[in-house]
Amino acid sequence: MALDPSEQHLRHVEKDVLIPKIMREKARERCSEQVQDFTKCCKDSGVLMVVKCRKENSALKDCLTSYYKDPAFYEECKMEYLKEREEFRRTGIPTKKRLQKLPTSM
């Protein structure tokens, strides 16, 4: 059965696993300042990070949650996923392999 590259239907695993994975990655990029603050706090606090880094942890969770709950952000990530899936169905080459540089000389 040949799959239509431009077909828009999403399977359960795509909706519940793959698109949320893209959302997590993009949200972490967009909340990079909070991620850095929390990481620095954890490194500086050692064992006491649970107590000392509550403020940084709350700021990070608030930032990430704001993206997770944004329907426009979900749609953006969904379209990105569909574009990658369409390209894979056309070429048979996963995105990661397509983006790797080929050696220029042997």
Swiss-Prot record:
* A molecular function GO annotation: metal ion binding
**Which Cys-Cys disulphide bridges does the record give?**
31-63, 41-53
Q: List the ranges annotated as motif Cx9C motif 1.
A: 31-41
Q: Could you name the Gene Ontology cellular component terms for this entry?
A: mitochondrion
Keyword set, alphabetical order: Acetylation, Copper, Disulfide bond, Metal-binding, Mitochondrion
Oligomeric state and interaction partners are given as: Component of the MITRAC (mitochondrial translation regulation assembly intermediate of cytochrome c oxidase complex) complex, the core components of this complex being COA3/MITRAC12 and COX14.
Under what name is this protein listed? COX assembly mitochondrial protein homolog
Organism of origin: Bos taurus (Bovine)
